[in-house]
């Protein structure tokens, strides 16, 4: 690289050293942008951690063993953003470092202390969740309050052992004027670099992947079991609905048959009575008809016409009954058709949607899977094969695990990669300044991610946070004095009455 100093500059300013372009400090605009983004991250992290800490402190029942680990994680983040981050923001201004190199070493050690404490806590949380899900019966006896506190103390003790070697000579820290950052000189001590990288990302990633892989498999099996149980309950429900509809249809048919038989008997009796009456009338007329046979014959013909008309009327009534029977049969068929349609669109209520867990939901495809299609061959209809497990049962656990691991790698992965790269490459001159700035942002981004990943994704904690924010921002207004005009003591209740005031009682 060429030097920024010319011969004339060297002669006139012999006391100033020449600085190559590769070691030029960051510009003022670069420093302002870095500081602004850091301040935004720190403000978001401060608010998120404080709100979550207040929720955990307000509800003592939430401070179980697992949530105590989460609370310890919040403490490490708050210490990081309150004791370390302000100095990082201050040093982002070009050519500004107010203190000596010893303070720089102490600042790097303090940064690593809180970072290692955070990493160790995340590892403990992973193991704790593994034990609580895979061994739920023995978990209370294994993870007692005493062991929980011992693990918390252990995270800080191990973090102190991991972060303090630069203070007694194992590793070296200095202020990087080019990148405006107080950082480790990783190439000066490769052994400490290897120890830091293994402690930062290798061991934690192995533990997290191992624990959460087993947890994911267990969650998948549990969801599959719950899905099969719900599927069986849906089958039973469909069968019960069909049986009830069939029973109601059979009862309606029996009632209709009884009514039709009763009507037929009643009509037969009526016709028999009418025939008897007509026979009596005919005999009377025959006795009285000595004057002429023509009248009796005419009357006989009239009786026959009456009988024919009654027969036609009875036939019409029978046709009407048959028509009503057909209408009722059509209505029964329509009811059966509705029953068959309803089998494919069962209305699932809240009790059906929740079975042991809140996330078990059945879509229309799942409900249709309960009904075996009639078009399939009998070999497939009688098979015991279950429908494939819906994706929603697997994506929930996979999403949570992915967010946990990805956020961890995103925050500390670039920092560890830079440390390994510094063993072979001169980071101060070869790595672009914007890359260093992005790595700094990602390093402090974990303080913003931890409250969301380990706090707000928990349903109980999320509900408590929402309740607290509602009480804080939506305060209930006190009732007005005239809201109850009929009660004594209010303006409406004291109208037209003399009520002595406090002043009149104490002063003449």
Curated annotation (Swiss-Prot):
It is a multi-pass membrane protein. Signal peptide: none annotated. GO terms for cellular component: plasma membrane; receptor complex. It is found in: Cell membrane. Gene3D superfamilies: Rhodopsin 7-helix transmembrane proteins. The chain crosses the membrane at residues 36-56, 69-89, 107-127, 150-170, 197-217, 400-420, 434-454. Glycans are attached at residues 7, 13. Orphan receptor. It is linked to Pituitary adenoma 2, growth hormone-secreting: A form of pituitary adenoma, a neoplasm of the pituitary gland and one of the most common neuroendocrine tumors. Pituitary adenomas are clinically classified as functional and non-functional tumors, and manifest with a variety of features, including local invasion of surrounding structures and excessive hormone secretion. Functional pituitary adenomas are further classified by the type of hormone they secrete. PITA2 is a growth hormone-secreting benign neoplasm, also known as somatotropinoma. PANTHER family: G PROTEIN-COUPLED RECEPTOR, G-PROTEIN COUPLED RECEPTOR 101-RELATED. This is Probable G-protein coupled receptor 101. It comes from Homo sapiens (Human).
